[in-house]
């Protein structure tokens, strides 16, 4: 089950930049694998060892659930809950499992970058009108077809931090790191908004605080 677990986490990392549907499939697979594994006593022990922090994170979803009756549009509220369901499942699933080993981290991070490379290539083709888009705002935001422009910018900022992390930890080839840094820099400039730039600098500051 450990191999399946790491595979599904890698699938989730791969699909983060490719839209809600593949992410949902990966999340459902993770949840089913977690249930089929059983051994809930050991999982609860692991959560207690982490001072119930996974449950605290999962509680953020319950806050959304609490506010649902106060929503002006119940259908919109239910859709928001569906989108934020990972806030409930992922902390419990990840928090009840053993930490990832170095090789597992490499597989997960590599999957994230492969997915990001595919999505950025797709987005770039949309931005130069080779591929169509369903959005009609007439701005560069239309190129972000897999998610909102703001979320895509945040994802690019996260990828920038990950590349720096890989370079510092020497988990990846220097040529790979330079390639992705130039690619991400180009994309951030091309799709830049004030929020994207602020998000990048905020991510850099937070990332360096954790790295050093």
Please place each PLM-identified region on the residue numbering.
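Transmembrane signal-anchor hairpin modules in multi-pass inner-membrane enzymes, especially those
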Residues: 1-69, 75-79, 96-106, 110, ...
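Juxtamembrane membrane-water interface segments that cap and precede transmembrane helices
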Residues: 5-10, 133-145
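Aromatic-anchored transmembrane helix interface
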Residues: 54-60, 74-96, 107, 111-116, ...
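Alpha-helical transmembrane segments of multi-pass inner-membrane proteins
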Residues: 104-138, 147-212
């Amino acid at each position: 089950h450990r191999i399946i677990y790491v595979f599904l986490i890698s699938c989730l990392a791969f699909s983060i930049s490719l839209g809600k549907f593949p992410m949902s499939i990966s999340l459902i697979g993770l949840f089913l694998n977690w249930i089929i594994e059983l051994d809930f006593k050991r999982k609860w022990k692991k959560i207690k060892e982490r001072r119930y922090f996974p449950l605290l994170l999962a509680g953020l979803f319950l806050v959304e659930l609490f506010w649902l009756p106060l929503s002006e549009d119940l259908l919109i509220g239910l859709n928001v809950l569906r989108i934020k369901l990972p806030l409930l499942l992922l902390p419990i699933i990840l928090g009840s499992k053993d930490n990832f080993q170095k090789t597992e981290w490499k597989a997960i991070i590599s999957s994230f970058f492969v997915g990001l490379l595919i999505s950025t290539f797709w987005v770039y083709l949309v931005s130069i009108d080779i591929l169509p888009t369903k959005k009609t705002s007439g701005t560069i935001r239309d190129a972000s077809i897999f998610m909102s422009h703001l979320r895509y910018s945040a994802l690019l900022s996260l990828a920038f931090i990950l590349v720096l992390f890989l370079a510092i930890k020497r988990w990846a080839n220097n040529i790979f790191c330079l390639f992705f840094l130039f690619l991400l820099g180009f994309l951030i400039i091309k799709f830049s908004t004030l929020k994207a730039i602020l998000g990048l600098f905020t991510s850099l500051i937070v990332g360096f605080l954790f790295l050093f």
